[in-house]
Amino acid sequence: MNKILKPINILCFVCLSLLSKQAHAADTAVLRIGFLLPIYNDSNSSQSQKAIGQAALDYYSGVKIALSRLQTLGLHVRVFTWDLNLKNDSTLIDITKSKAFQTLDVLVGPIDQKSTNTIASHLQYTDFLWISPLKQLNLPNTVNSLNFFADDMYRIRGLIGDLRIKYPNHDWCLVTPKEQNERVAVWINELQKAGISYKKVIYSNNKISPKPPRKEEVLLINAGTNNFSKLSQYKAIARKYDSYIVGDLEWYQNVMSIDEVDEKRIIYPQINMIYGLDSLTESFTKEFVDSSLAEPSKFAFIGYDQLNYIGLNFLALGHDFYHHFPKGEHTGLINNIQITKATDNQWVNTGMRLNQLEFIEVREIENEENSEQDKN
């Protein structure tokens, strides 16, 4: 099961800030936010275009639920939406010159580098926060920017910070394939920067060498290995009561259960994760289904989490909120958000979730039920 409990997020901070502030003037209390997303598709659209469009639509639907809920907390918002699939380069340039664009507090999108470059090369107004919501993009350094999905360096840096807090007494082993890769180099560099000592372990031919330390508290941290390698790693720590395997950043894309492995000892780092329904995700899912007549994808949850975070910060801190992002980690429905400054006016999200899963064998449960019926 997911071992992470949802802590009190920045909502408490927002409430305290709102109580301590005088009412803003009407023209300064409005969050003006624009969305540039590829939503529209028709019969001539390719399958990949349709998939991207559906993801963007789900994201935007999650955004609308977040904004609706934030309005009950007192948020005043003006929303401007431009559909990228109905625009060409010349109309994108026209958008940057429009009155609506010139007064934005936040711009969300596009989600491709080509459109981003077109807009960036024609910017006249730069006093806003430009957000890349679904992938790492090169945003211009002439504006304040936030990438919600960071590259390996920042993801690994965030993961190191989380592991350091949660497992302060454990010995660290970096498990790598025999053939070194770029991710291994990033791990080594970030571990050195953090001043963390570690033992290097090689995974090859379904074996790891050398063996982990004798200590009971050991972390086997994977860099560039495959999901199946956890079997040989688990054998090395099975008798250590407080040792864990930390999967590679890609493991959660293809989680598989291996009979000989106790999944409660495997940690899957992930930026976002849907695992079951607690009361908060269940409430969101119901509201999404009622409004969209479909189950929410992960993109709907991402849209909700991101805009909930932005809106709460705007409520608490005003128009220049992005210069004062809180240092604490915000736990959303499926995303942990930890904003880290990359440069003077560029930020990235380094929040990670440490997921531990528990697989339930349904067939065994059914057999037990049948046995009870036979007895009766």
Predicted regions mapped to residue ranges:
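Extracytosolic ligand-binding ectodomains
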Residues: N2-L5, A23-N376
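Sec-dependent N-terminal signal peptides
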Residues: I4-L16
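N-terminal signal peptide c-region/cleavage motif recognized by signal peptidases
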Residues: S17-K21
